[in-house]
Amino acid sequence: MATGPRYKVPMRRRREARTDYHQRLRLLKSGKPRLVARKSNKHVRAQLVTLGPNGDDTLASAHSSDLAEYGWEAPTGNMPSAYLTGLLAGLRAQEAGVEEAVLDIGLNSPTPGSKVFAIQEGAIDAGLDIPHNDDVLADWQRTRGAHIAEYDEQLEEPLYSGDFDAADLPEHFDELRETLLDGDIEL
């Protein structure tokens, strides 16, 4: 490790590869709440966060495991569940009085058509005003999960174990999306 009077130890969260402080500062300067989109292999999370005097304050959040409360039976780490998680977070943000936000993807790569942009698309469809480029959003059929259903039809054995059939994923997605957008449920 480097030593000497000119060596500067990076901040802890930068050393752990958890925070890009230059990007964070640019997002905070906008003065708008941040739509924090985080993904893992099994789940996705969407939070609307503002800067507070004692750290960040969460105004609204949704986790892909929350979708089970509304009837989601498919796995929670795919594109359709990312979109629905963003939609749910956007609806909860609307209830909290948030109207606009900026997307914070953290250290995730800004790959067009990825799950973080599916979260953004869901929040936009919920009514949030988020500046974006339409080129980064995935094709609607991919967001619905049609690519998963097509892959399942090619397999000899079912893609998912259990009662859920992956061939029904686009229809299941449409049903839950309509349920969330109708507003007949408690968020």
UniProtKB/Swiss-Prot annotation:
<dbReference type="GO" id="GO:0003735">
    <property type="term" value="F:structural constituent of ribosome"/>
</dbReference>
<dbReference type="InterPro" id="IPR005485">
    <property type="entry name" value="Rbsml_uL18_euk"/>
</dbReference>
<keyword id="KW-0699">rRNA-binding</keyword>
<keyword id="KW-0694">RNA-binding</keyword>
<dbReference type="GO" id="GO:0022625">
    <property type="term" value="C:cytosolic large ribosomal subunit"/>
</dbReference>
<protein>
    <recommendedName>
        <fullName>Large ribosomal subunit protein uL18</fullName>
    </recommendedName>
</protein>
<keyword id="KW-0687">Ribonucleoprotein</keyword>
<comment type="subunit">
    <text>Part of the 50S ribosomal subunit. Interacts with proteins L5 and L21e, and attaches the 5S rRNA to the 23S rRNA. Has been cross-linked to L21e.</text>
</comment>
<dbReference type="Pfam" id="PF17144">
    <property type="entry name" value="Ribosomal_L5e"/>
</dbReference>
<dbReference type="GO" id="GO:0006412">
    <property type="term" value="P:translation"/>
</dbReference>
<comment type="function">
    <text>This is one of 5 proteins that mediate the attachment of the 5S rRNA onto the large ribosomal subunit, where it forms part of the central protuberance and stabilizes the orientation of adjacent RNA domains.</text>
</comment>
<comment type="similarity">
    <text>Belongs to the universal ribosomal protein uL18 family.</text>
</comment>
<keyword id="KW-0689">Ribosomal protein</keyword>
<dbReference type="GO" id="GO:0008097">
    <property type="term" value="F:5S rRNA binding"/>
</dbReference>
<dbReference type="GO" id="GO:0000027">
    <property type="term" value="P:ribosomal large subunit assembly"/>
</dbReference>
